[in-house]
């Protein structure tokens, strides 16, 4: 009788991938990167084990949004003080904080517990085409579509 393979945390081999965000749509890029961080692209995927790979995203400032989202989409945060609600448009976020914009989209697609926080630590987002992870010899990952 065959049994289902369950990966052990010490058996997981991690790779490093580079994804170029230039000209890509935010949500489509985020969903594929979230799947890589979870490890769903591997045949040894196990839901309760962090078996994902490291992902480096470059050119974060060149991410695209469809429709009128650049001006209509709003990002909210609160300082936890009365009247402390801060609001930014997607255009402000892309101009000033493109890393946060991508991180926020991807974090929302990961599991919400301790395992999700562990997976999120394997995401590295940078403006421009330079990154400090050359020593890890990352492979270029081509996104679908």
Swiss-Prot record:
One of the GO biological process terms: negative regulation of translation
Keywords of this entry: Ribonucleoprotein, Ribosomal protein
Pfam families tied to this protein: Ribosomal_L13 (PF00572)
Record-linked InterPro entries: Ribosomal_uL13 (IPR005822), Ribosomal_uL13_bac-type (IPR005823), Ribosomal_uL13_CS (IPR023563), Ribosomal_uL13_sf (IPR036899)
SUPFAM superfamilies linked: Ribosomal protein L13
Cellular component aspect of the GO annotation: cytosolic large ribosomal subunit
An annotated Gene Ontology molecular function: structural constituent of ribosome
The protein's role, per its UniProt record: This protein is one of the early assembly proteins of the 50S ribosomal subunit, although it is not seen to bind rRNA by itself. It is important during the early stages of 50S assembly.
Entries under HAMAP family matching the protein: Ribosomal_uL13
NCBIfam families per the UniProt record, alphabetical: rplM_bact
Family per similarity comment: Belongs to the universal ribosomal protein uL13 family.
Quaternary structure note: Part of the 50S ribosomal subunit.
PANTHER family the UniProt entry points to: LARGE RIBOSOMAL SUBUNIT PROTEIN UL13M, RIBOSOMAL PROTEIN L13
Protein's name in the database: Large ribosomal subunit protein uL13
